[in-house]
A protein has these predicted regions:
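Small-residue-enriched flexible segments
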Residues: 1-51, 55-56, 60-327, 331-340, ...
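Short beta-strand/loop segments at the ligand-binding rim of alpha/beta enzyme cores
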Residues: 344
């Protein structure tokens, strides 16, 4: 397995990090994370397909790009992979052809032959597609308990629309996936939050999908007015700084759900994923040091305690809310991950509108918010 990293800025591709793959014709896979403007750039698409004609290409818009220990804006981070012993298969569907995101997720996983399938990497539209329904649908078709990880595309802090593409110019509503086959590919994942929870446990008493109307039989909007104060109607995405810890019915662990908006017309809070009635919830707040520690913990967990673990590639997908909180210090959470791996490991990723991975690194994949989620790849 050989990995090349490129940075696309000012209409040119520059090798960043690892050296160029000796034979571009042997490249199997391209992963491109970039600003909406650049991933939809026909020149970039042409440059990549001309340079690596045999490679499958997945492109995804972001809320910031990650390359090694740096975070970029208005760029495209391109990772080119040449597998020596691993087979890949790709699939892509658009929400337009389905009744809901659950059915899309089910159908997407059914595109893959389960025999020899080790893991699947998912890149999804981050606004039109319901991430929690997508994850549930994928797991409904996950016959072999295959590891599924990935993330939801971003649009900076604008939240207008997001783009994903497979071997074509990216567009809205798309979910793309790549499956990895064979015994020679070692894929691992880890997802850690680092947010503090506070206050009593409460129960969601009225909700519909992502819309929460009542908590403890009290208006969720009124309750959040006490919590958020003037931020309740803030137009600068400050609500992203106040996620909700959610324990779904029948589950033992909390997951985070970001607030996307407040609907005074419907008198409800709108979250980034489904929160069913009967869910136990607690308020959350950011702790700068714990966010950084969480990124470090994610890197440590993925090694399984092996201090010599040095994967060829690490994909980092972190939430846009974390980026807003960390501000100018955002590279610190990327840096602690980079410090944990050796120079052998190529690091790429993006800031997302949601992360997809198992809960506590075991079991079915779920939609997460406010986490640092790492997926590593290594041929053995």
């Amino acid at each position: 397995m050989k990995v090349t990293q490129l940075l696309f800025k000012n209409q040119s591709l520059v090798v960043s990090g690892k050296d160029e793959i000796e034979d571009p014709l042997k490249a199997n896979l391209i992963l491109g994370f970039g600003s909406k403007r650049l991933v939809a750039d026909e020149q970039l698409n042409s440059l990549l397909t001309d340079r690596y004609p045999s490679a499958e290409m997945l492109l995804c818009s972001t809320a910031g790009e990650i390359a090694y220990n740096s975070v970029y804006d208005d760029s495209a981070v391109i990772t080119v992979i040449s597998f020596e012993k691993t087979t890949i298969k790709i699939a892509s569907l658009n929400l337009e052809g389905f009744n809901d995101s659950f059915e899309l997720g089910k159908s997407l996983i059914q595109q893959f032959d389960i025999t020899g399938l080790t893991s699947i990497l998912i890149l999804s539209d981050g606004l039109l597609v319901n991430g929690s329904q997508l994850a549930s649908g994928m797991e409904a078709s996950n016959r072999g308990n295959v590891l599924i990880t990935g993330g939801l595309a971003g649009d900076g802090t604008l939240f207008n629309n997001t783009l994903v593409g497979l071997n074509s110019i990216p567009k809205t509503g798309t979910v793309a996936a790549v499956g990895f086959y064979g015994d020679s590919i070692d894929v691992r994942s880890s997802s850690v939050s680092g947010w503090d929870v506070f206050g009593p446990e409460r129960v969601v008493t009225s909700a519909n999908g992502t819309d929460v109307y009542e908590i403890d039989n009290r208006s969720a909007v009124d309750l959040y007015k006490i919590y958020l104060g003037p931020y309740i109607d803030d137009k600068t995405n400050s609500t992203l700084l106040f996620p909700l810890a959610v324990k779904l019915p029948g589950r033992s662990h909390y997951i985070a759900r970001s607030i996307l908006s407040v609907s005074h017309e419907k008198n409800c809070m709108i979250f980034s994923g489904d929160i069913p009635e009967g869910s136990t919830v607690r308020f959350m707040k950011a702790n700068f040091e714990k966010l950084i520690d969480a990124a470090d913990q994610a890197a440590k967990e993925i090694s399984g305690g092996d201090l010599n673990y040095a994967p060829e590639l690490a994909i980092l997908i972190s939430c846009v809310g974390r980026r807003i909180i960390l501000g100018k210090q955002v590279e610190e959470e990327v840096g602690v991950v980079a410090d944990y791996f050796t120079n052998k490991t190529a690091i790429a990723g993006f800031y997302s509108y949601g992360e997809i991975s198992p809960q506590m690194n075991i079991g079915p994949c779920q939609l997460h918010n406010q986490t640092m989620t790492i997926t590593t790849f290594n041929e053995i």
